[in-house]
C-alpha cells in the first residue's frame, strides 16, 4: 500500500505480534467483522492512555456494530503487555517495532522522533479490506473512537 492511505483504499494484509507474543493477521480480525485499527505514538503516555481507555470503555458500543478494536504502536511486545495489563484492555495491542505497517499506511511522521515517530491515526476497515474512514487527530483523543463508531453505525444502518 502506498504512503498516505485514504478512504476507499484497500489495506494489504499484514502480520504482527500482539501483547501476548501471538502472531496476528489483519485478515484474521476482518473474518469476524470490520476493524478499527488505531495507531498511537507510545504506550503508557498520557494521551495514548486516554485514547486507549476510551476504546476500552466503548466495548459494548463496538460490539453492537460487530467491530473489533485493534491498537498498534512501535512499542515492544513486553511494553504492550504491560500497557494492556495496567489498564485492562479487552482488545489486542499489536507491536510494529520497525514501523513497517505504519509506513505502509502513511502513519510515520516526516521527522524522526524515535518512539514518537508514529502519528495518532485511526483506520476504520470494512471486511473487504476497504478503508471506510481515516481519522486524524493528535489532540482530541476521544475523537478516534467516537468518529469510528459513527461510521460503523452508518454502515450498519445501510
Predicted regions and their residues:
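Chalcogenol-based redox active-site neighborhoods
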Residues: 1-158
